[in-house]
Amino acid sequence: MANEVRVARLESLIKDVINNALANEINDKIAKLARVTAVRLSNDLSVAKIFLDAHKRESMLKVLENVNKVSGLLRSKLAAEWTSYKVPELRFVIDETIDYANHIDELFKKIKQQEN
């Protein structure tokens, strides 16, 4: 297992490279809407789970689909910066943290209203 500092550094590198590529080097207008919010590497560094968000939450499935279409290009951009032995497989998922936080906020508002 890689040490925590190294893993954190590699996760940060992946986030920076993918965000930069999506913003500046991808021609797909829908994929450009995505931004990386977090990256989690597997223990053996072979898989990177990349959490995506977009300004328009209702279009996230289409954004995810288009990002997956350009994943090979994104992986090659990452390979140019990668310092470890093998570039990880990229797995893109929708980051549901914002939706969850909004749900919790709504619950707190309901509780506050019931107290008043």
Curated annotation (Swiss-Prot):
Location(s) in or outside the cell: Cytoplasm
Domain of life of the source: Bacteria
Coiled coil: none
Keywords: Cytoplasm, Ribosome biogenesis
Main localization, broad class: cytoplasm
One example GO MF annotation: ribosomal small subunit binding
GO cellular component term, pick one: cytosol
Task performed by this protein: One of several proteins that assist in the late maturation steps of the functional core of the 30S ribosomal subunit. Associates with free 30S ribosomal subunits (but not with 30S subunits that are part of 70S ribosomes or polysomes). Required for efficient processing of 16S rRNA. May interact with the 5'-terminal helix region of 16S rRNA.
Database matches in HAMAP family: RbfA
Protein name as annotated: Ribosome-binding factor A
